[in-house]
UniProtKB/Swiss-Prot annotation:
Residue ranges, annotated region (Disordered): 439-466
Assembly and binders: Cohesin complexes are composed of the psm1/smc1 and psm3/smc3 heterodimer attached via their hinge domain, rad21/scc1 which link them, and psc3/scc3, which interacts with rad21. Interacts with ssl3.
Keyword Cell division in annotation: yes
Cell compartments where the protein resides: Nucleus; Chromosome, Centromere
Family as reported in the entry's similarity comment: Belongs to the rad21 family.
Protein name per the record: Cohesin subunit rad21
One Pfam match: Rad21_Rec8
Protein purpose: Cleavable component of the cohesin complex, involved in chromosome cohesion during cell cycle. The cohesin complex is required for the cohesion of sister chromatids after DNA replication. The cohesin complex apparently forms a large proteinaceous ring within which sister chromatids can be trapped. At metaphase-anaphase transition, this protein is cleaved by cut1 and dissociates from chromatin, allowing sister chromatids to segregate. Also involved in the DNA double-strand-break (DSB) repair system.
Biological process terms in GO annotation: cell division; chromatin looping; DNA damage response; double-strand break repair; homologous chromosome segregation; mitotic sister chromatid cohesion; mitotic sister chromatid segregation; mitotic telomere tethering at nuclear periphery
Amino acid sequence: MFYSEAILSKKGPLAKVWLAAHWEKKLSKVQTLHTSIEQSVHAIVTEETAPMALRLSGQLMLGVVRIYSRKARYLLEDCTEALMRLKMSFQPGQVDMIEPATALQSLKGKDAVTQSANLTLPETITEFDLLVPDSTFDFQWSQLLRTPSRSSNTLELHSLPISSSPSFPSSQLSIEAGRNAQVESGFSLGESFAHVGNDMQFHLPISNSGAATPRSVHSDNQSQISIEVGRDAPAAAATDLSGIIGPQMTKSPASSVTHFSTPSMLPIGGTSLDDELLAPVDDLNLDLGLDDLLGDEQGANAPAIEADEQAETSSIHLPSDIMEDDSSRPAAAGVEEGQVVESATAPQQEKINPQKTVRRQRAIIDPVTELSSKQMKKQLADTSSITSPLCLNTSSIVFNATVNFTRNGKFNTSIFSSNLNPKVNELLQADFKQAILRKRKNESPEEVEPAKHQRTDTSTENQETAEVLDPEEIAAAELANITEAAIATLPQETVVQPEGEAPELGSPMGFPVTALESADDSLFDAPPVMLDEADLLGSERLDSSVSEALPSSQTAKDSLRNKWDPYTEGEKVSFQTLSAGCNREEAVQLFFDVLVLATKDVISVKQDVAIQNEITLTAKRGMLLSSL
């Protein structure tokens, strides 16, 4: 097959299309993406290059479909890759940092805006910036509890919780505190020293005092840990500086030095922070003359200081989260630490304890696992439950009709259309070949040389009659002339059967004798010189007419099956029942079918003289089979 130059060329709208239709694997991704489907389809439809056959255009369309499929697959892969990159870029904690050396090299030649956008600041936050901020002694409640974003929620002083430290929800706390972040709660002095002892590894004799010091900025019942301490670490003990500073720290000072600065509102135990820090100054026994000065300042400024304190603490702004936390907190605030620890470790113990696996039920074993010998013998003796009656006639009526419809001449009507030419339908008949063979057989004696000795008294009338009549017409006429009266008048002769052959069903049983039996045997036994050409032709016609009068075994069986289709061997039916509703010719033909099948041992025939010579037919094994 020759292709045009447009198809076999390396360039053009049809170059890659033809290659994709035959060798798709040889096309690369670039060649596939650069192929224009619109131009290729336009070239195929319009046939600009050369007229193409239907097969060639179909192959080119196949190539177009394959190129389109590969383009769609490439597009899907690109979209999937882009989507995965977007998902990976938005993952929490994923930052794509570029290397410094490669960044400077890649940024050469770009504008200043792109360079400034890609620059990153160095990390200047160190470990020392994450420590607890230094405590100042001039904190006020208004500074600690004021929230700018939620200033509308006001809380009166009498509605504050009784706890020694304010309560904050755990969601507002962070382990790492910012540099300029506001202090979210008050810190006790003992707690601050406890952290110093833990961080600097100072073995200080810190013990619990009677003062209740807060261990955390939370107020819930669970054990919470301060900043820079492990989440699940044991609770730090409350600190008391009485052992370090001296026993004089515990006694309340006569004159407080807190008047040097603004009074602190952070409660630590029963005393204030300033009193505990500056208490040793009173015990130094130094007569500096400051008592009078402090006494005068205290006496003069005492009412003003108390008024300022009342103004600051009368209206305190708290976030709404604190209000909800305080309202939902149980009334019993003084819970022992042992109960808190148990409640905190209870969920962990539940997680550690494995769940009990449900045991599967064991399979129940049958008590009887073997059959007894008596039961086995009983089953062998009685097999009615496992056997069924033998039915050799497995073929149905529809199957038999399908197998034998060619013999009935219905093959053409079921295969070809009804408007077929009659002459063509005649040629397609199943018996057309048989008719040709019979015609050749009848014409063959004319070609044979005549006998040497011929009789001189041959009559021309017999020859003219033989030439005019057709063998088929003769057989049909002889079959039509057979009537009951003709059958009764046929001569009945006793035929001697050789040994080993089946007995012929002749006149002893009352059956009529066929034309073959009534023919004169002298015609066949006479020497050839006694027969002329007309007699020889007449004998052959007689043989053919008799053979046509007697149906074949399969035809007789099929004809009988149309009226009687037994299912089991030994099934019986009477001839009067089969011939009921038949005319005279059909009854004679049915009788001949019965005779033929009886000679082939397909059925057995019996005539009962006691019951008005009734003929009974019994089916044998051959009748149950589909073919003989």
